[in-house]
Amino acid sequence: MIKKVTIEKIKSPERFLEVPLLTKEEVGQAIDKVIRQLELNLDYFKEDFPTPATFDNVYPIMDNTEWTNGFWTGELWLAYEYSQQDAFKNIAHKNVLSFLDRVNKRVELDHHDLGFLYTPSCMAEYKINGDGEAREATLKAADKLIERYQEKGGFIQAWGDLGKKEHYRLIIDCLLNIQLLFFAYQETGDQKYYDIAESHFYASANNVIRDDASSFHTFYFDPETGQPFKGVTRQGYSDDSCWARGQSWGVYGIPLTYRHLKDESCFDLFKGVTNYFLNRLPKDHVSYWDLIFNDGSDQSRDSSATAIAVCGIHEMLKHLPEVDADKDIYKHAMHAMLRSLIEHYANDQFTPGGTSLLHGVYSWHSGKGVDEGNIWGDYYYLEALIRFYKDWNLYW
């Protein structure tokens, strides 16, 4: 069961309803800009990968060792599906072979981000063309992910030595990573994958989401008893603030998981989390990096959080009952957010190694990628555009 959370009424819905809906032509033009950038980046990265965030809006080149590399490959698959250019497919497949090698050698995989790595890269290729090596890599990644499952508390431990008190926590981001396990269940019929994903989802829904439908970034459990302990931040402004990207992981992770659980209490959880996010957007509909900030705060936006939220709202609109009073507002809100990203945050400099989406934040506390592009922002921006452009078979 999912606990009851506050569902705020959407404030001033006319701020979304008055924005014209995007046309297919407008979306197509925005995708064409991204494709132009990716064509430059293909030659720039070749078979290597971008770093998580840019420096002066250009990505340095790195090996396949970060938690973010799957988003680059996911961009290539999206670009291939749209353009049918073999150049995108060929490099994306070479990336997939690199991911297979990485999981076989267990290179920098002792964390929960296996889904971010293997879903938009390997699972994507398998869904597109049935590639056997892509399937093999995806299932091996799922097996690696369930090694982090903690019976006491019923969750996937995010980082650090397994079972250690100082690391005994989940994070809201993992709502996206557990989609890897639902895929493994569908492919193998092995119930353990489903059960672990389900358990982690409910542990997250009932703990990392606060009663007011805002979210902690991370939540600790007692390793001796498995009882919930406390929520703290790692990327947000403070322990009691609401990190924008974390909230958007909730906006997207809930509908993705609903597809498998069919638990209709997900609807109210989604509405609570999403309405909280929408009510804290500034005038241009693109969130600051923490939702305690708004217009006049002199803080950085996180465009990636808004791109993720657009994808989440788009996904849940497939499932919400037609009689839901907010359904039309959600539709207009996602259009308003994506329109703002297209018109004010899309990069049109077309530099080799450049980002597609400006004004993101990687880690404010660490001073990394503040007011820069980041590779998940680029990915989810393109995914949102593709969602609006065509009937897309999602990778997640």
From Swiss-Prot:
Function description: Catalyzes the hydrolysis of unsaturated hyaluronate and chondroitin disaccharides. Also degrades unsaturated heparin disaccharides. Releases 4-deoxy-4,5-didehydro D-glucuronic acid or 4-deoxy-4,5-didehydro L-iduronic acid from chondroitin disaccharides, hyaluronan disaccharides and heparin disaccharides and cleaves both glycosidic (1->3) and (1->4) bonds. Prefers sulfated glycosaminoglycans compared to unsulfated glycosaminoglycans. Probably required for mammalian cells invasion through the degradation of extracellular sulfated glycosaminoglycans such as chondroitin and hyaluronan.
Organism this protein belongs to: Streptococcus pneumoniae (strain ATCC BAA-255 / R6)
Activity at various pH: Optimum pH is 5.5.
Signal peptide positions on this chain: none
Lineage: Bacteria, Bacillati, Bacillota, Bacilli, Lactobacillales
Residues annotated for substrate binding in this entry: D113, D173, G231, T233, R245, W249, S363, S366
Entry-linked Gene3D superfamilies: 1.50.10.10
Underlying gene: ugl
Family of the protein in this entry: Belongs to the glycosyl hydrolase 88 family.
Protein name: Unsaturated chondroitin disaccharide hydrolase
